[in-house]
Amino acid sequence: MLISNVGINPAAYLNNHSVENSSQTASQSVSAKDILNSIGISSSKVSDLGLSPTLSAPAPGVLTQTPGTITSFLKASIQNTDMNQDLNALANNVTTKANEVVQTQLREQQAEVGKFFDISGMSSSAVALLAAANTLMLTLNQADSKLSGKLSLVSFDAAKTTASSMMREGMNALSGSISQSALQLGITGVGAKLEYKGLQNERGALKHNAAKIDKLTTESHSIKNVLNGQNSVKLGAEGVDSLKSLNMKKTGTDATKNLNDATLKSNAGTSATESLGIKNSNKQISPEHQAILSKRLESVESDIRLEQNTMDMTRIDARKMQMTGDLIMKNSVTVGGIAGASRQYAATQERSEQQISQVNNRVASTASDEARESSRKSTSLIQEMLKTMESINQSKASALAAIAGNIRA
């Protein structure tokens, strides 16, 4: 039940505070004019009663006669029976109609199950504006959060790409080093083998052919000495032909010796020592022997030349093999470097991809930080707007409480 105080202008109160329906789909408001018309009081009559909600501007100054005039008017109005009856009738009708409207609204609210009570009309327009701004900032906050999450994923993907690229770079560098070392070692081994084989061949030539050449050279010198010795044969000492006899000593009872199947005859008139006569050596070589020696000398010299040519060819081949092996060993570093350069090129490409991934990671991380900062600022602004809305609602509630207190008074 509503309590009405005749000291309050009912028309002004009901005109400023209308009752609205809580339904969002079919809202209905009742003004003071409708209530007064329903009880038979027109606008002109309300104006005559001084109950018009229109307020006039206050006087520029309060006169000393004003309080007395107001007091006199109130006393006269209280003593006026017709006015008291009209005011009582108006208060009763307003109370009745207001109770009916409230009961109707309550019944409609109870009938509408699942619908919320609409309090949008109870707030000021500033609150509605702040609510719209709050919704906008909330949308921006959600967009910043989603953007920050996606940028974080991009940064994480870039980090994973960088890590995998670093692994591939390491594998390329390792495989390049292994292939370069293996190829270089293999080529060096081939060159060393060729050089060693050349040394062995040269050693064999010096060992076999040189020995044969020395032997044949010695024989050739001997034959030449025989042929060029002016038809003389030297048996290791000069003046051998001056020896004419060889004395033999007598030993034991047997004083005879058999030399070259020649019997030594004893001479009774000589001493005990017997002598053997020696003829002069033949200093001339027969033409047959000279021809044989000359032929042999030619054969020996031919063999010497053949062995020398064979040794020279063998040594040339050996030197060629040594030079080939040495060249292969010297070029093994170059060939190994070429083989490892391909892997180094792949590793360089991986490093370039790493740099690109690192740049993407930094850009995504920076953008994600900026998005998070924007989201944080949006959240702070939303909180500030909520505080402002709460302050406005508190001010509105205080005003409504003051009005309700005035009504109860």
From Swiss-Prot:
It comes from the Bacteria. GO terms for biological process: positive regulation of protein localization. The keyword Nucleus does not apply. Signal peptide: none annotated. Keywords: Host membrane, Membrane, Secreted, Transmembrane, Transmembrane helix, Virulence. Residues 350-378 are annotated as: Disordered. Residues 350-368 have a biased composition (Polar residues). The chain crosses the membrane at residues 119-140. It is a single-pass membrane protein. GO terms for cellular component: extracellular region; host cell membrane; membrane. NCBIfam families: IpaC_SipC (TIGR02101), PRK15373.1 (NF011900), T3SS_SctB_pilot (NF038055). Belongs to the SctB/SipC family. The core secretion machinery of the T3SS is composed of approximately 20 different proteins, including cytoplasmic components, a base, an export apparatus and a needle. This subunit is involved in the formation of a pore, called the translocon, in host membrane. This is SPI-1 type 3 secretion system translocon protein SctB. It comes from Salmonella typhi. The gene is sctB1.
